[in-house]
Amino acid sequence: MDDVLSKRKIMYKYETHCHTSPVSFCAKASVAETVQFYKSLGYAGLFITNHFLDGNICPSVKTLPYNDQLDFYFSDYEAGVREGEKIGISVFPGIELSYKGTDFLIYGLDKSWFQEHPEIMEMKKTEELQLMMDSGALVIQAHPYREEYYINHIRLFPRHVHGVEVINTSQKEEANEMAALYENTIISWRPVDRTITGQAMYSRNSAAKG
């Protein structure tokens, strides 16, 4: 029986960190192009984690009222769901929060949650992360050791995340190695409920980078 089961094992691939245009200002690929791209690679699904309202979102949107910004923000995800249903790939919502070049991937909160919590735009980042965790979100620090010209120093938040992203192919290998060390030594030993280690699989050919 075990032999039969082992032969039937199936590996499912999910992209957990990607950006789409026009919501994320850094992205070049449209939602449809992105969803079709991951479908062509054999992925079972993807999380659309565009930069949130506090980050690298389309600049003209930031002058709109909060709920209008949310409508624009979630429009890519909603279009992604429709495209996924057409071609047979699951599309899930996520967001990427930003704080002075430090980014966090948030999973498990839908549009209605953000509509009910406009106060997050005025909260300290640690308070915002804690509120999201208390609301059931999974919080992952993205590329914690990324080095860019606009990042003046590395910031770590071990008490306000469930895990860290340890694979990001847009980063140097040394940055991923340090993230894995941090995850396996500091984060994994904290006395909190941890269910997964943050990971993201980027295609080097993808135009949607984080």
Task: List each model region and its residues.
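A metal-dependent hydrolase metal-coordination microenvironment
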Residues: 3-126, 159, 166-182, 198
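Structural recognition of alpha->loop->beta junctions
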Residues: 155-172, 204-210
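Short beta-strand/loop segments at the ligand-binding rim of alpha/beta enzyme cores
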Residues: 13, 132-141
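Hydrophobic beta-strand scaffold residues
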Residues: 91, 139, 186-189
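Short acidic/histidine-rich active-site segments
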Residues: 184-202
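Short secondary-structure boundary segments
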Residues: 50, 143-144, 168, 192-194
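Active-site-proximal loop/helix segments of hydrolase catalytic cores
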Residues: 28, 121, 140-156, 171
